[in-house]
């Protein structure tokens, strides 16, 4: 079976790991895709999904390595996210979909659309990254830094420092939401997962 149900959603079995998603409402399908930073998850879309579900079938997805999805020890690339998005639309949604994506997830959505135009109706890009940011080419120092971060003790230490409750609170206040009262406990918990 391709999908597993849990109390809060479903799991889609993809080749590199299980991908968590939610499905609510009925009507035309809409897929909501969160940013690709390490703490991101579909929980970012909770309030929007609730409103859209009144007239649509709304899917939120936790991309591989994020939220309640598996976090395999693999190299995460934009093209991997293209493959996930394409497979998810084909296997789970099963028909053309409207998509909304934020920040770093916008590039894989654009590429998925370029490769499989028949899967997407409308695409909404929220705060997309600039082409200038996307044109960076890895060099030898990038590979060295990646190898250091991939060392279990060092990588785990850095991740734990970056995703501590204090750092996540600062991230929310500085980057995402200027009014602290809008930050739900569920959203914070999703970032800690």
Question: Each PLM stretch: what is its role?
Answer:
Residues 2-4:
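Short, small-residue-biased leader/transition segments that mark boundaries at the very start
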Residues 17-68:
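Conserved HGGG/HGGXW glycine-rich cap/lid loop of the alpha/beta-hydrolase fold
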Residues 42-44, 69-75, 134-137:
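Conserved catalytic-core motifs of eukaryotic protein kinase domains, centered on the activation segment
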Residues 46, 86, 110-114:
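Short, hydrophobic alpha-helix immediately C-terminal to the catalytic nucleophile
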Residues 60-100:
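Active-site loop/oxyanion-hole signature of alpha/beta-hydrolase fold enzymes
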Residues 94-138:
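Conserved hydrolase catalytic core segment
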Residues 134-135, 159-193:
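Conserved alpha/beta-hydrolase catalytic His-Asp/Glu region
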Residues 135-154:
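A catalytic-pocket lid/entrance helix-loop region that shapes and gates access to the active site
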